[in-house]
Amino acid sequence: MAARSVSGITRRVFMWTVSGTPRREFWSRFRKEKEPVVVETVEEKKEPILACPPLRSRAYTPPEDLQSRLESYVKEFFGSSLPSNWQDISLEDSRLKFNLLAHLADDLGHVVPNSRLHQMCRVRDVLDFYNVPIQDRSKFDELNASNLPPNLKITWSY
């Protein structure tokens, strides 16, 4: 037996041994050995690197009868009798605004993005949005097609 003094108090510390083996070795006999965990490897299919980035939006060309289509939708949702300045009708009612824009998106195949919805305050704003054509080309394609100086070339495959 060994004795220790901790702040004036004497303690007895026993060396814990069972049949001549230290405590750690005694208890380690009862521990189960952990089996090594085999990690299954999953083969990932790697997609080929694109030669050019995918296009963000589809092309849109406004139809010739856009104004008459929009006027018919406005008559359908806001009533058959329209004032002469029907393009200045306010779109404050969110249900009517949603119905109008949803039907136009289905009909024309071009959706008003979320970032522009707050700008659609009047029917004229909707008409102006749908009158703008959208090209299906990226800026790099436009640069490639334009007349570039001889020392500047755009090459997709490198």
UniProtKB/Swiss-Prot annotation:
<keyword id="KW-0687">Ribonucleoprotein</keyword>
<comment type="subunit">
    <text>Component of the mitochondrial ribosome large subunit (39S) which comprises a 16S rRNA and about 50 distinct proteins.</text>
</comment>
<dbReference type="GO" id="GO:0005762">
    <property type="term" value="C:mitochondrial large ribosomal subunit"/>
</dbReference>
<keyword id="KW-0496">Mitochondrion</keyword>
<protein>
    <recommendedName>
        <fullName>Large ribosomal subunit protein mL50</fullName>
    </recommendedName>
</protein>
<dbReference type="InterPro" id="IPR018305">
    <property type="entry name" value="Ribosomal_m50"/>
</dbReference>
<dbReference type="Pfam" id="PF10501">
    <property type="entry name" value="Ribosomal_L50"/>
</dbReference>
<comment type="similarity">
    <text>Belongs to the mitochondrion-specific ribosomal protein mL50 family.</text>
</comment>
<keyword id="KW-0689">Ribosomal protein</keyword>
